[in-house]
């Protein structure tokens, strides 16, 4: 079938098209069958993989269960496995030369020993192993008992008629130690003779000597606690006398150890021991107070130094010793219950009380603890025993507790009881005999002297340590400075060597290391100098400076305040009160429908009001809804009162229901008025905004007469900015509004400047033209889409009518192709002449004006005329030729225009050739259709195509 269109002869072979369509359908069917087969194969493969995976997982789980059962039955399995792994790793490390031979053999022996032990342990798990083990143990025990019996029998036979010393000589001879044991045995003989002279046996003597240190400790403790000397002599002296068989024997034993040498050594050792004990006591008294303050969060609000000053102040006017006073202070501070004032009052009273009556400080403090727990009840209980309160004092303490807090009440109650007992203890002290007063003064003097010795001893020890440490630091400083000098010398030598030609990299690593040593030495020297300054500052203050520093350290940054403790107590009371109320309410059983009934009644009331809606914009206020809820609650409670017990809150609500409803109605009326007023205010705001907008619109309308559309739009935008700003609460004269208007005018000025720039407009137009011409993807896409759609329409027309008109299709496709090529040639020509970039179909680029300069004429059937800068006429074929010579090499898939010598032109679009010939026989459209479908199939099956992606998805590739 041949049609002539605008002088062009087009030949279409319909049978070829039909064969192509049939081949395409057969291929599509075969492709679908292949895809189905491939999908089935993939599914079966996936099922097989899943089953294999499940089988492997089941085997792994069974193996794990077996190992767990084996380990549960035989606990040696895991240990032997670990030893096996360790042995393999040891062999590997030994073969690599990491483990020395000696270590390897030693560890190997240990592994063998461990394996043997585990093997025996495994054998013990069976009945045969247990029986063999028991039999071996029985044989071993029998042999040991036999040997022990014979040794004991021989010893008894050899001891007949011999003294203890002779038996020791015999035993030493058996062991081969006669020479070494001879001096010791001689001392035993001397001791035996002394015992015979004293009239007691060796056993009694050993027992007496064993008990002597404990008896001496009891004597010292009794004297330190204030017990009279005569009582100590009666109690402890009699025990010591009886232990050694009388007074004479006792002094004989003691005198036997005294000689000029032992006496001097004893005095020296005793003096050092006394000083050490005194220093330790001083250190412990300070640290105990500090630790007590830290453990209690510093609730007392003082430092250790302040508490120590309190102790010294009390000791000046008290009959008690400074040591006992410090113990009382420490115990009170560690309790965390008392403030500084309370500690001072309790300590003073307790010290006098204990010194006058001999009662322990802990017992006295326990009396004050009754006040700390509850001041009113505590005073009442103490008064039952000590009879010290007067009428009205308990009421005063209770008033303090309610008005100023628990802490203030405890302080006042403590002071009241402490003052009374202090006066009574002073009366007891005044009535003491002269001997008792003298003994009390001696004890106090001894305690004060002991404290002074302890403080100075502790300070002197710290001073000596600092002096020695300072000397060591000075030596370290000299060494650090020497390291710095040596490293500097080495570094300077390396730098001098590096300055020589070709030696710039010499010793770079060593130089860096030496520089690090210099820096480290300087830092170390500075730190040592700082430490030395601190030591010198401490040494200048003398030995007592260390004691003062110890008492001042560890001051807490934040003290636990009385207000915090009082707040915590009140918080605990409130929680306890709420819990009691909650427990009381939890006993009331409410019906599960009460809450639903209450909500239902409230919703019905709200619905009724909404149904009676008569005014525009009428709304329910929150207060009105609350009224409905209150009325519903009261109605439900009335009904529930006959079915269950009401809580106190519910009873109170029913008792005052009329008043409650009246107040709720008043709130509802006010709430409705507020809602209505809010609506009126909103309407007022909307009205004002509308008036402002219309006023601005009217002014803008009047001002825009005679203006262009663009100026009118600008006036409207400026008016809207002003109106929106005023409606938001601003005023017309605000600086912010003027800034907004200025910014908008600046934008208009920039827009006008752009409109006046004709060169930029030309450049923009050329750039847009170039973007459209060089958009090969979009242009070819459009051509291909038009071609496919046109072919589809043509095929439909042919199949339905038996006729096909190729005229419009050919016009459109050929026109689009020629337009695309012409646009690119024009753009490349102009761009090349202007020194810009030129582009090819394949996306390549070249610069300069080579496209125009390399154009050569080529015979063509048609010539398109275009206007260039020189006015020369250039044919389209010549332009296309110049493009080809300057890098526009079209690929097989790119559109191509080929001019034949015969005058015909063939346009190739994606492999489909359309031959345009005036008067010659056409090749037909069948070849183009066939090539087009082949290309579509090839692209679908190649990498990235639809068929390829489908197969990859199914196979998991």
UniProtKB/Swiss-Prot annotation:
One GO term of the biological process aspect: symbiont genome ejection through host cell envelope, long flexible tail mechanism
What does the record list as coiled-coil region(s)? 42-72
Q: What subcellular compartments does it reside in?
A: Virion
Q: Which InterPro entries match?
A: GpH_LAMBDA, Phage_tape_meas_C, Phage_tape_measure_N
One Pfam annotation, family name?
TMP_2
Which GO terms of the cellular component aspect does the record hold? virus tail
The entry's keywords: Coiled coil, Viral genome ejection through host cell envelope, Viral long flexible tail ejection system, Viral penetration into host cytoplasm, Viral release from host cell, Viral tail assembly, Viral tail protein, Virion, Virus entry into host cell
What functional role does this protein have?
A: Serves as a ruler that controls the length of tail by stopping the tail tube polymerization and is probably released from the tail shaft during infection to facilitate DNA translocation into the host cell. Assembles into a multimeric linear form probably arranged as a coil of alpha-helices and stabilized by the covering tail assembly proteins. Its C-terminus fixes the tail tip complex, thereby forming the tail assembly initiator complex. Tail tube proteins polymerize around the tape measure protein, displacing the tail assembly proteins.
Protein family according to the UniProt entry:
Belongs to the Lambdavirus tape measure protein family.
* Quaternary structure, from the entry: Interacts with the tail initiator complex presumably through its C-terminus domain. Interacts with the tail assembly proteins.
* Protein's recorded name: Tape measure protein
- What organism does this protein naturally occur in? Escherichia phage T1 (Bacteriophage T1)
User: Which lineage?
Assistant: Viruses, Duplodnaviria, Heunggongvirae, Uroviricota, Caudoviricetes
């Amino acid at each position: 079938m041949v049609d002539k269109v605008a002088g062009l002869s087009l030949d279409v072979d319909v049978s070829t098209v039909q064969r192509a369509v049939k081949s395409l359908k057969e291929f599509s069917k075969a492709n679908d069958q292949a895809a189905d087969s491939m999908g089935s194969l993939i599914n079966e493969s996936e099922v097989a993989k899943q089953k294999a995976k499940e089988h492997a997982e089941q085997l792994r789980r069974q193996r794990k269960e077996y190992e767990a059962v084996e380990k549960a039955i035989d606990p040696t399995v895991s240990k032997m496995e670990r030893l096996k792994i360790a042995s393999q790793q040891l062999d590997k490390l030994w073969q690599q030369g990491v483990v020395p031979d000696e270590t390897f053999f030693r560890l190997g022996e240990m592994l063998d020993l461990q394996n043997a032990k585990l093997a025996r342990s495994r054998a013990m798990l069976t009945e045969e192993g247990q029986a063999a083990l028991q039999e071996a143990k029985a044989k071993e025990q029998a042999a040991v008992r036999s040997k022990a019996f014979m040794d004991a029998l021989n010893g008894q036979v050899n001891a007949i008629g011999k003294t203890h010393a002779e038996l020791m000589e015999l035993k030493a001879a058996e062991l081969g130690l006669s020479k070494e044991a001879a001096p010791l045995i001689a001392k035993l003989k001397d001791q035996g003779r002394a015992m015979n002279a004293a009239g007691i046996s060796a056993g009694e003597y050993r027992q007496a000597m064993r008990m002597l240190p404990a008896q001496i400790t009891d004597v010292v403790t009794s004297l330190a606690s204030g017990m009279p000397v005569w009582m100590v002599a009666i109690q402890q002296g009699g025990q010591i006398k009886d232990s050694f068989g009388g007074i004479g024997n006792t002094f004989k034993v003691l005198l036997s150890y005294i000689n000029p040498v032992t006496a001097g050594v004893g005095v020296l050792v005793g003096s050092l021991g006394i000083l050490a004990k005194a220093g330790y006591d001083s250190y412990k008294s300070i640290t105990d107070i500090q630790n007590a303050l830290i453990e209690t969060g510093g609730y007392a609000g003082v430092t250790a130094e302040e508490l120590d000053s309190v102790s010294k102040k009390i000791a000046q006017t008290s009959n008690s010793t400074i040591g006992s006073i410090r113990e009382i202070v420490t115990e009170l501070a560690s309790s965390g219950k008392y403030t500084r004032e309370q500690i001072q009052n309790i300590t003073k009273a307790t010290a006098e009380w204990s010194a006058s009556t001999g009662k322990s400080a802990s017992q006295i403090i326990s009396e004050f603890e009754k006040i700390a727990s509850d001041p009113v009840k505590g005073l009442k209980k103490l008064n039952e025993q000590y009879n010290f309160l007067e009428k009205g004092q308990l009421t005063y303490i209770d008033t303090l507790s309610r008005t100023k807090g628990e802490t203030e009440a405890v302080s006042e109650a403590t002071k009241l009881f402490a003052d009374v007992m202090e006066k009574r203890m002073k009366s007891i002290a005044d009535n003491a005999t002269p001997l008792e007063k003298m003994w009390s003064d001696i004890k106090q003097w001894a305690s004060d002297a002991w404290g002074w010795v302890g403080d100075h001893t502790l300070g002197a020890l710290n001073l000596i340590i600092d002096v020695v440490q300072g000397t060591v630091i000075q030596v370290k400083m000299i060494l650090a400075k020497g390291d710095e000098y040596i490293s500097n010398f080495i570094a300077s030598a390396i730098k001098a060597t590096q300055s020589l030609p070709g030696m710039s990299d010499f010793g770079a690593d060593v130089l860096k290391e030496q520089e690090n040593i210099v820096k480290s030495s300087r830092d170390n020297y500075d730190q040592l100098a700082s430490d030395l300054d601190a030591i010198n500052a401490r040494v200048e203050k003398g030995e007592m400076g260390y004691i003062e520093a110890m008492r001042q350290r560890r001051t807490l940054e934040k003290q636990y305040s009385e207000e915090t403790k009082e707040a915590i107590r009140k918080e605990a009371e409130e929680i306890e009160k709420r819990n009691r109320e909650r427990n009381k309410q939890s006993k009331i059983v409410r019906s599960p429908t009460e809450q639903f009934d209450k909500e239902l009644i409230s919703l019905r009331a709200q619905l009724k009001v909404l149904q009676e809606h008569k005014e525009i914009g009428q709304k329910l206020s929150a207060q009105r809804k609350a009224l409905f809820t209150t009325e519903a609650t009261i109605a439900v409670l009335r009904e529930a009162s006959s079915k269950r017990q009401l809580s106190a809150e519910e009873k109170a609500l029913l008792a005052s229901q009329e008043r409650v409803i009246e107040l709720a109605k008043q709130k509802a009326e006010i709430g409705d008025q507020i809602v209505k007023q809010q609506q009126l205010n909103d309407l007022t705001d909307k009205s004002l905004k509308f008036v402002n907008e219309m006023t601005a619109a009217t002014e803008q309308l009047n001002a825009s007469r005679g203006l262009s559309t663009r100026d009118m739009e600008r006036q409207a935008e400026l008016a809207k900015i002003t109106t929106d700003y005023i409606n938001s609460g601003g005023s017309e004269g605000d600086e912010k509004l003027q800034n907004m208007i200025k910014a908008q005018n600046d934008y208009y000025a920039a827009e006008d400047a752009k409109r006046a720039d004709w060169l930029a407009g030309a450049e923009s137009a050329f750039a847009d033209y170039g973007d459209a011409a060089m958009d090969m993807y979009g242009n070819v896409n459009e051509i291909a889409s038009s071609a496919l759609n046109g072919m589809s329409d043509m095929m439909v027309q042919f199949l339905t009518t038996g006729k096909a008109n190729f005229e419009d299709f050919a016009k459109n496709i050929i026109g689009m192709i020629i337009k695309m090529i012409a646009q690119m040639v024009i753009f490349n020509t102009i761009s090349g002449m202007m020194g810009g970039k030129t582009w090819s179909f394949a996306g390549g680029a070249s610069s300069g004006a080579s496209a125009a300069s390399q154009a050569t004429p080529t015979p063509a059937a048609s010539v398109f005329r275009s206007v260039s800068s020189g006015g020369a006429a250039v044919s389209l074929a010549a332009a296309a030729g110049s493009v080809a010579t300057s890098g526009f090499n079209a690929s097989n898939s790119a559109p191509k225009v080929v001019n034949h010598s015969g005058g015909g032109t063939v346009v190739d679009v994606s492999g489909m050739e359309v031959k345009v010939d005036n008067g010659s026989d056409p090749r037909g459209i069948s070849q183009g259709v066939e090539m087009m479908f082949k290309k579509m199939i090839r692209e679908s099956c190649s990498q990235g195509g639809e068929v390829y992606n489908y197969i990859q998805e199914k196979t998991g590739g």
